[in-house]
A protein has these predicted regions:
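N-terminal pro-sequences and low-complexity stem/linker regions of secreted or lumenal proteins
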Residues: 1-223
Length: 223
């Protein structure tokens, strides 16, 4: 059996590789907007330089893939980012990150070999895309009611739809996935509520651990 891994093809237009096989990414969007040190997001938060939209992927060591019998890196990594946002002081421009930041946590795998809930079969045309097993998703914000559970069918395209909704972009305008997404995640929060006070998450490792960690970076599996 061979391995057909086409994920890099999806960002080829952003990477603009310097060689047909291998090479470095030379595209301006990649060079200017892709930071290959995951912990830099923590210093960006602390320095009040967090980008309006940030896609944060941990190193392989701090991902939730089952490489070890006990893996505390992944949960601690997520907690460090949420805590950094929630505990960040008022920025010089008056911005309070906890009051205007939504943190969307999801995984690329479902964590097992079975799901008792069969995936919905989408009507054509869908190209080669259909739903698979469910994956976890957590929506963190000051305007999400505590312990809220949403039972609608969401998908990865819903994340794009949320960004479009939040920044006034025509919903469904970015790609195939968001155009066919069932939701835009707005059911997870109510902007008319007063922001809930942040409660620090207890974790065995904090932001300074990840910022100061000199362990060689490894790629997260499949990313």
């Amino acid at each position: 059996m061979g391995l057909d891994w086409t994920a890099p093809n999806a960002i080829e237009h952003i990477c603009q590789p310097s060689a047909p096989t291998g090479g470095k990414c030379t595209g301006p969007d990649f060079v200017n907007n892709v930071d290959l040190k995951p912990a830099d997001v923590l210093t960006d938060i602390g320095n009040c330089k967090l980008a309006a939209v940030s896609w944060v992927i941990p190193s392989g060591t701090n991902s939730d893939h089952a490489a070890k019998l006990v893996n505390i890196g992944g949960p601690a990594w997520v907690a460090s980012i949420v805590n950094a946002v929630g505990n960040n002081p008022v920025c010089p421009n008056g911005e309070v990150y906890w009051n205007n930041t939504a943190i969307l946590v999801t995984w690329d795998d479902w964590g097992g070999w079975y799901d008792h809930e069969p995936p919905t079969v989408l009507p054509q045309p869908q190209g080669d895309y259909q739903y698979g097993f469910r994956v976890p998703f957590v929506f963190v914000s000051a305007y999400t009611p505590a312990a809220y559970v949403d039972n609608q069918r969401h998908d990865f395209g819903s994340v794009l739809r949320f960004i479009e909704h939040n920044f006034g972009i025509t919903e469904g305008a970015l790609a195939f996935a968001d155009a066919r997404a069932a939701t835009d995640l707005t059911s997870f929060y109510n902007p008319n509520l007063l922001p809930r006070p942040f409660l620090t998450i207890s974790a065995p490792k904090g932001a300074q651990y990840f910022i100061n960690d000199t362990t060689p970076l490894t790629d997260p599996d499949d990313d």
